Amino acid sequence: MPPKFKRHLNDDDVTGSVKSERRNLLEDDSDEEEDFFLRGPSGPRFGPRNDKIKHVQNQVDEVIDVMQENITKVIERGERLDELQDKSESLSDNATAFSNRSKQLRRQMWWRGCKIKAIMALVAVILLLVIIILIVVKYRT
């Protein structure tokens, strides 16, 4: 609901005002004309007009309720968007970490493959040397 105007003011509301203004604002006495403008007309001749005013006031109240619901929905949507943004940042960070780790693992596997190939080549060279030495020793004797 929209804020209503205060009929009685606190001292904090009127700080800095001239004393006569403060005294007039804080008086409890009000005349009939003031009451007429604050409360509206009353009596039988204002009946249909009063119904229209009530109808318009009801429509205004409905619009206010709808606007409050819309504001609540916008706030909730903003919160969900913030959560979604946090999750997407986290996902992006995880994707970057995964990419870096996969590159590191690829390098490790490449070196492991190189080591295995080097060991197999060394074993093949040793076998060839053993065979050659055996052949040389057999023909010398």
Curated annotation (Swiss-Prot):
Phosphoserine carried by residues: 17, 30
InterPro entries: Synaptobrevin-like (IPR001388), V_SNARE_CC (IPR042855), VAMP4 (IPR042887)
Disulfide feature: none
Subcellular location(s) per record: Golgi apparatus, trans-Golgi network membrane
Keywords for the protein's UniProt record, in alphabetical order: Coiled coil, Golgi apparatus, Membrane, Phosphoprotein, Transmembrane, Transmembrane helix
Domain v-SNARE coiled-coil homology: residue ranges: 52-112
First-listed, main subcellular location of the protein, grouped into a coarse class: Golgi
Residues on Vesicular side: 137-141
Renumbered residue ranges of the record's region Disordered: 1-51
Transmembrane residue ranges: 116-136
Biological processes annotated in GO: cellular response to type II interferon; endocytic recycling; Golgi ribbon formation; Golgi to plasma membrane protein transport; regulation of Golgi to plasma membrane protein transport; SNARE complex assembly
Top-level lineage group: Eukaryota
Bilayer topology term: Single-pass type IV membrane protein
Ranges facing Cytoplasmic side: 1-115
UniProt GO cellular component terms: cell surface; phagocytic vesicle; presynaptic endosome membrane; SNARE complex; trans-Golgi network
Subunit structure: Identified in a complex containing STX6, STX12, VAMP4 and VTI1A. Interacts with BAIAP3; this interaction is increased in the presence of calcium.
Family note: Belongs to the synaptobrevin family.
Record function comment: Involved in the pathway that functions to remove an inhibitor (probably synaptotagmin-4) of calcium-triggered exocytosis during the maturation of secretory granules. May be a marker for this sorting pathway that is critical for remodeling the secretory response of granule.
Annotated protein name in UniProt: Vesicle-associated membrane protein 4
Native organism: Bos taurus (Bovine)
Gene name as annotated: VAMP4
